[in-house]
Amino acid sequence: MKRLCFILFALCMVSCAPYIQVATLNSDTVQLSDKGEFYYENEVARIDYYFNVKENGLFSFSIKNLTAEDIYVDMAKSYFINNGIATDYYGRSTTVTVGKSFSDSYSFGEHVSSTYTTSQSVSETKTAASYVGIPGESARVFTGFMISDTHYTEKGFVEYPYQGYPEVREFNKDESPLVIINRITLIVGGEEIVIENKMYATKYVNALDNVYAGYRPYSENLGNNQFYIIYDY
């Protein structure tokens, strides 16, 4: 099991020093690469997950077709599920065209994981359809899902800890206050393939931004499979 950790929200400014909240997400299926990419992969597709640290944890993901044939996403059977509230993917796709060599880097916004490897131009389109095609060796991005419009709070959890030293809350899988499920139904050669990845928060940390300055901007293995990815606001 990998622990995926990202800056979830900037809390506020106190004496010109920003407080931040860091959320650790665990997943039984999503992996963290050496390059800090959160991804799932099978023989048909690779799914990369992005958390936009500048927009209150805006959630996006890409599906890369690893085959030479077209595959399709069944939008009516694909969902973003945030703490039990389901949102379908209808009208939320953006096309990214990539080449066979996957050699160069393409940045997508301010996301934690933000590179596509491509040797061709990148095109973006919006679409509203029941089925969305992904050509062979291409990728499509789905974006616009908000995890929350505020940081996590609970009674006794200090938002502005003394001198900025970390204030910590930990949870097990069953009691997690944040559970995100990404369910995708692919049509491959006329057959349905359902991919479901769950990510759940197991730790929240409130602290001054500069407390974590030493880890910025790379992911580092701090032991016990804990990965911290820190970005400035």
Protein language model annotation of sequence segments:
Residues 88-167:
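Intrinsically disordered, low-complexity Pro/Gly/Ser/Thr-rich segments with frequent PxxP/GP/PP motifs
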Residues 17-21:
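Bacterial signal peptide processing site
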Residues 44-56, 60, 66, 169-173:
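Short, solvent-exposed beta-strand/turn "edge" segments of beta-rich domains on protein surfaces
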Residues 61-70, 82:
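Asparagine-centered strand-capping/turn motif at beta-strand->loop junctions
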Residues 69-77:
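Short, hydrophobic/aromatic beta-strand segments
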Residues 12-15:
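C-terminal motif of bacterial Sec signal peptides marking the signal peptidase cleavage site
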Residues 143, 147-222:
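Terminal connector regions
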Residues 24-48:
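Post-signal peptide N-terminal segment of mature Sec-exported envelope proteins
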